[in-house]
Amino acid sequence: MTSMSIIDDENVKKTSNGAAVVTDVAQHAVSDSDNNKAQLLGDGSNTEYVVDIFIEAAKDGDLKVVKDVVESGAVDINNDRIDELSGLHWACINNRFSVAKFLLLRGANPNQAAGPGGATALHWAARYGNIYIVDLLLKHGADPTLKDEQGLNIMHFSVYSSNILLVVYVLYFVVNNNDNVDIDSKDNNNRTPLLWAAYQGDFLTVELLLKFGSTVAWTDNRGFNALHCALVGGDQRVICDLILSGANFYERNNQKQDCFDLAEGMGTKSLFEQALQHHGYDRLGNQKDKLFKKSSHAQFTIFLSPFLLMVYIYLISLVLSPVLAIMLSLLVTVVMVNTLKKFVLPCLPRKNTYKVSLTRTPFFSGLFLSTFCFLIYIWTKKLYPYSVSDYTMKNVQFLVTSFLTVVLFLRLVRSDPGCLKTDDSLTSIQETIKQLIDLGKFDRENFCVETLERKPLRSKYSFFSGALVARYDHYCPWIYNDVGLKNHKLFVFFAVTVQYHMFLFMWLCLAYFKKTNYIYEQVEEYARCALLKNETLCKGSNYDPSTFFLFIWISVNFIWLGAMLIVQFFQILKGITTPELFILIKEEHKAKFINLIPFENSIYTSESKGVEDSDMIPEGPSATTITHTISIDGLEPRNRRRAILSACFSMMGINQWLVTIKEIVGITHILHGQVPQQHHSSLLRSFLVTNHWKTNLTDFWLNSDVTAPLWQRFFYSSDTSKAMLGGTEVDYYELYEYPAREGEVLRPN
């Protein structure tokens, strides 16, 4: 903990005294008359009293009182407190931009050290993550090379704030431009910013520092390296990042403890062992031989494994009873999945993510294709011969949908979802940050810390693609790709085709089962089923278990895909994407059950054009970094169970489906504008969900090329970044505010 922590956090928050009280006192204490001014300046007790008023006003951001006091000459803004924090310090701590700017323009010294740690206003602003204040101070001559009594500089304090955006700012505007501020700056204990970030468990900061070239091998006075600190902090992603960067497992600290000893003592042994396993090491830190030298071979093996599983299930269904075949199939599936996780996944690269899961591999696309191939095999060998004479058209439709399924699947796997190209040059990144700061929009909603570029509206960073995806909807493991602006319509065509294809297969299966019933008409024991009450299904399970098992598997997928299509069509009708629906659900849930009002910052809603206008600067501690989080540990046991259950539902997509059904039948009105008043500030709600359903359908199904024939606009997706939104053509790669509807002017985002 730094020396700044000596001051209690309550002392740096907004005081409980109302601004009106301070203003009233100031109006009596500070007068424009020369007599009163002389009286105040001549009386030491009165001067101290006015200084107290000045400090309280600086804390509260009461610019009027601050101006009155300063212009009266009652205080010296560079000597307004002795051995304590000045008005400028308090304004910087509490993120009072207008007050800080006024004091700096009046000649306040930004490099004055104050407080028990001898920190400057820049140090305090960085400590509390106040980006706009830091930018203001640097523009008014604050020296970023200064250190406090503990040897901490702006780089340490920005990391200590846990504000990744401030770390980005300092790296690109201070470290890059000043040779005296090093990314591996050391405090009096020889701790670098990377050691601090690892100890705090800030994986975003650690990743950024490593990307910027921070030294992993550096140790502090206690002999702790970055991996030691990460094991104390207990964040697995940080541990994984440092292992990937070559951290030494066996290096010992001053207490002769290596990483294994430290993990044992800190209770992070399991996290450390999992991280080692994720990156191809055994529990002792020895590099394990990889089963595949090339990651492409590992991916191909994962893709083929479902085919082997399907062949196995088919073969055992021919020789074993249905119950035993199901049990063995489940057992082999579990063994296969665990084998892939243990031996094959470690062979894959960790691009854009700290560990690889099976859903981010070709496994599910292989499962889809193997199911499709098995389905075609059963149709060719069994269903077609029995049904071609009676159901010719159904078989023709099945053949056509089979062809379309293959074509659409291959196109989707290779399609571009709408990834934005990144300009990672230093000049481009600095210009983007500077532009966002001037607009008052340098926040996580408008800036992507993974790609270091401005985020267009409705875009989202994809760890799978490693890029921002325009109008991002979701990642689909079945097509091994993201779904976004350029392939969303193609994905819906694919899903509808697959759904109808499965329907035809199930229909032909039932016809096949009925037609083969005559074989067992005289053998009653074969028609006895303990679970199946339907005679057709019962006889089908006894006569042809392999076809019956495939029928059940297809039926399950038919139900699941049908529910997904209901959600997709509902979202298309409302003009929103899956992440946007989740945002609205989360917003509604928090307001209803946890009594949280969504944070509203005037910096995002003001029509002013820049941060120079003091009225649009966020006033309040860390106003630029406030986020809403829910701690499960802090909830009542009943609410904790509900939160865990809700998380599981979200992962399975059940929440999404339930909300859709409730909206359709009118039980809830999340998307109809009938919500508490505090939600109406949401631009997402005010624009997207209030568009007419016909407009939303047109936006999705027709591309923006109005010169093309209607059928072509419907069936073809645009290869460019342009599409319709609210009936207006927009460029989704540069969409930074929603287009205004006719007769309406919307606030910029």
Swiss-Prot record:
Residues 446-496 form the DHHC domain. The lineage of its organism: Eukaryota, Fungi, Dikarya, Ascomycota, Saccharomycotina. GO terms for cellular component: fungal-type vacuole; fungal-type vacuole membrane; Golgi apparatus. This is Probable palmitoyltransferase AKR2. It catalyses: L-cysteinyl-[protein] + hexadecanoyl-CoA = S-hexadecanoyl-L-cysteinyl-[protein] + CoA. Its EC number is 2.3.1.225. Residues 382-392, 511-546 are extracellular. It is found in: Membrane. It comes from Saccharomyces cerevisiae (strain ATCC 204508 / S288c) (Baker's yeast). May be involved in constitutive endocytosis of a-factor receptor STE3. ANK repeats lie at residues 49-79, 83-112, 117-146, 150-183, 189-218, 222-251. Glycans are attached at residue 534. The keyword Thylakoid does not apply. Keywords: Acyltransferase, ANK repeat, Glycoprotein, Lipoprotein, Membrane, Palmitate, Repeat, Transferase, Transmembrane, Transmembrane helix. Belongs to the DHHC palmitoyltransferase family. AKR/ZDHHC17 subfamily. The DHHC domain is required for palmitoyltransferase activity. Residues 1-306, 349-360, 414-489, 568-749 are cytoplasmic. Signal peptide: none annotated.
